Structures are given as C-alpha cells and as structure tokens.
Amino acid sequence: QVGFRVEHPQSLVNGLAYGDLACRVVTGNSRTDKANLLRHPTEEVLSRDSEALLPVAAYRLAADVGDHSIYSFCMCPGGQVVPALTKPSEMVVNGMSYSRRHSLFANAALVVSVGTDDPCLDQSKGARRVLAFQRSLERKAAVLGGGDYVCPVQRLTDFVEKRPPKKRPPPASSYRLGVREASLHDDLLPDPLADALREAATGAFERSMPGFVGDDAILHGVETRTSAP
C-alpha cells in the first residue's frame, strides 16, 4: 500500500462526525477548543459533566476502484504528521496522536493497494520489485521536498483537479520540519494509482464525509510503510 498522509483541521473532522453536537468536543487545550468553537459556535452553556462532552472525532474510510482498494489507515485524531525516514535521501511520513488528542489537526494514511503483478512495478526486479518501487517513491518525495527533511504537500482539491501549486504561502500543517507545495498528482504516484485515489476521494469518501475534499485537506508525501520496512 502506498499513498499519502491526509490532514484536516480536527475541528472540521469533529463537525463531519458530530454535526451540531461538535461544540461538545473539549480537549482541555485552550487553542484547540477555541478553534472548535469558532467552527461550531453555540449559545448553550455546556456542562463540564463528562456525559455532556464528546471525544475527539475519528474516521475510517474504504473503497474499491477497479483492481485497487483505497482506504484510510492509522487515523490519528488530535495528532501530528511525523517523519519516518531512515536515510536523508528518503522522505517518508507517518502519524501519531498525543495522549490527550489535543492538537489542532487530524491525520490518517490514505493509501492504495499495489499487487505484486501491478503494472506500476518493474517486473525485472524479481522478488525485490515491490521494495524497489517503495524506495523509488521515497526518493522522489525527498527530491520534491527539496531536502533537509522538508515534506512535499499538496491541497487535496488541487490533487483531485490536477492543478499545479500556486504561488502562495504553504498550507498550515502539523509537520514540524517544514513543508513545500508540489505537484504530487504528476510527480510522485504513477497515474493509475493517483487516479484510483482521486476517484475514491471524490466519490465514496466525499459521500461518507461531505467536506472531506476541501482546501483544508492537505496531502503529505509519501506514506509507504504501512506494511513494509
């Protein structure tokens, strides 16, 4: 499985999960709770009684597109996108949640399955063809980031519309080592895999969570180690 870390504001995910009750999500972090109430204002004076409160929202998504399965994995509510590379020439991301899940952001792997006979693989590599493909994506991601552990990112709306990055400040992200906008739709995943992700995101995922595809959704590249070293 290969793909990206997709990140949304946690307040958006709360709203998608709870609707009008999203104002009842309280983490104890003043900045996070203020952001949640700004998105979900209420005139109700909420009780601090635990029965009146809701946990930070999470999600799980899955769809099949042709021969590929696309799904979210390791969803991290109130979390952070973190580096998971083992060499400076690679760029690999993962996700984590704090124990209190009180970050402004929520992230999850958004990956597509790749079979051992997939045309995207170089079959001349034999038994090492999947690992070779994984490493090639990680090296491409490092180049797109520009080095120094900077992560290449793209707004999900630009990815699905196949739009190049605009000259504007990089999007907000929990990734702490810096982000750089890139054309992930063109320069990272092979077209069949990118197209499958695009169809799942705009189809099944958007139907399940209206608002999943939006300017607030940011793809971080690349997620390659859900089931590989």
Language-model features, listed with the residues they occupy:
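Residues forming the flavin
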Residues: 1-229
